[in-house]
């Protein structure tokens, strides 16, 4: 592990200035922390996308975490984008993530286009390349650097290093954008994203953070963290949740609850 961390720092020290794509997840947080350690805060900026794809709780947590960990010196640029204006994204094919990542990282790069020495960094890790991730193609095409992947860091490695560094989100469940909750082929609409965000926020407030509310065709598929499943099965939260999503216009079958 020490060798991988040393390799990460060594690769970062070769760069003059960097911009880290920061989401608030453990991968991008560790990468940003390592970049600040290797280069100093004045040579690092964080770029954070603000859009309808970020849940309200996720957005608040990301900004609060940044303010706690990097109170001085590191600039945070919040970049507003409108994915619902990207027709190739809204169509929601199996290449949705490719189109989104390509648009988003182009926009990030445009933010510092005059600073030719500044490189954009992404928090992809070694486990990500073992999965189907269309966004990886966009990362390669745009020549975005992936220092965690290059250092051979797995998700488990990253969580351990984040814990050792005192990063409070080291055990935070992985959280993708709200569009991933909509079944492939169904158009991405603002109304759907709002309902997903509202349902997941309800579960979070009820003591089930990290739950996912998926819309597959006309059915709801709910994912609850493994350690919380037993409690979810026996508490009155089920009835409260059923009432809540009914008010949003959805029926719900508790046979469609799985662990994540």
Regions found by a protein language model. Give the residues of each.
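ATP-dependent adenylation/nucleotidyltransferase module used to activate substrates
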Residues: 1-164, 205, 220, 236-251
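Active-site beta-loop-alpha junctions enriched in small/polar residues
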Residues: 125, 216-218, 258
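Mid-to-C-terminal catalytic subdomains of enzymes
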Residues: 149-203, 207-213
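A short interface-forming secondary-structure element
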Residues: 217, 221-234
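Short proline/glycine- and acidic-rich turn/helix-capping motifs at secondary-structure junctions
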Residues: 253-260
């Amino acid at each position: 592990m020490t060798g991988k961390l040393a390799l990460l720092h060594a690769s970062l020290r070769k760069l003059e200035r960097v911009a880290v794509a920061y989401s608030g997840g453990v991968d991008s947080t560790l990468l940003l922390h390592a970049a600040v350690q290797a280069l100093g805060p004045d040579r690092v900026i964080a770029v954070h996308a603000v859009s309808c794809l970020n849940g309200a709780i996720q957005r608040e947590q990301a900004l609060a975490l940044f303010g706690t960990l990097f109170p001085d010196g590191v600039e945070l640029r919040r970049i507003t984008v409108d994915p619902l204006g990207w027709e190739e994204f809204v169509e929601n094919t199996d290449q949705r993530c490719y189109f989104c990542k390509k648009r988003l990282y182009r926009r990030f790069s445009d933010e510092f286009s005059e600073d030719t020495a500044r490189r954009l960094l992404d928090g992809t890790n070694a486990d990500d390349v073992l999965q189907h991730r269309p966004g990886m193609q966009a990362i390669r095409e745009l020549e975005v650097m992936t220092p965690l992947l290059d250092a051979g860091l797995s998700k488990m490695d990253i969580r351990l290093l984040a814990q050792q560094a005192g990063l409070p989100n080291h055990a935070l469940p992985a959280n993708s954008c709200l569009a991933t909750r909509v079944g492939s082929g169904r158009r991405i609409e603002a109304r759907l994203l709002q309902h997903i965000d509202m349902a997941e926020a309800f579960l979070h407030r009820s003591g089930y953070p990290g739950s996912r509310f998926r819309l597959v065709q006309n059915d709801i598929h709910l994912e609850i963290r493994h350690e919380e499943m037993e409690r979810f099965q026996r508490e009155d939260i089920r009835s409260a949740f059923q009432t809540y999503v009914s008010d949003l216009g959805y029926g719900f079958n508790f046979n469609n609850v799985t662990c994540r």
